[in-house]
């Protein structure tokens, strides 16, 4: 493990903002599908995968709004479909996270997702 050793007579001080982790964000956002009321998720990085999964949810009927650069508001109450088959799904490897949430809400799911070896599977 790496570490920093600071030698000297001046103590360190200040603030550091830590951005949310990409892999955690794309796993947490689909879980909103299971909610029966709007959710606000904070510390979400402003990256393309978050934008893609937001667009997927919007196409499924959710209302998604970025409140500021690190906060996402999602209202999943209008999602009426267990199908997530769009060009956005094809462009994102982590779209398989939608499977569990859709199965949990609708007891079935159809998600076209891209595996690293470029095989599309429909569940």
Ranges and model annotations:
Residues 1-123:
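Structural preference for solvent-exposed beta-strand-turn elements
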């Amino acid at each position: 493990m790496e570490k920093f050793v600071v030698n000297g007579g001046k103590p360190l001080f200040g603030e550091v903002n830590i951005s949310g982790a990409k892999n955690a964000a794309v796993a947490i956002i689909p879980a909103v599908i299971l909610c029966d009321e709007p959710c606000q998720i904070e510390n979400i990085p402003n990256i393309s995968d978050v934008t893609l999964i937001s667009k997927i949810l919007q196409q499924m009927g959710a209302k998604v709004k970025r409140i500021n650069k690190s906060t996402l508001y999602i209202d999943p109450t209008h999602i009426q479909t267990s199908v997530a088959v769009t060009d956005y799904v094809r462009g994102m490897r982590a779209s398989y996270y939608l499977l569990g949430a859709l199965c949990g809400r609708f007891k079935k799911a159809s998600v076209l997702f891209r595996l690293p070896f470029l095989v599309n599977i429909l569940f």
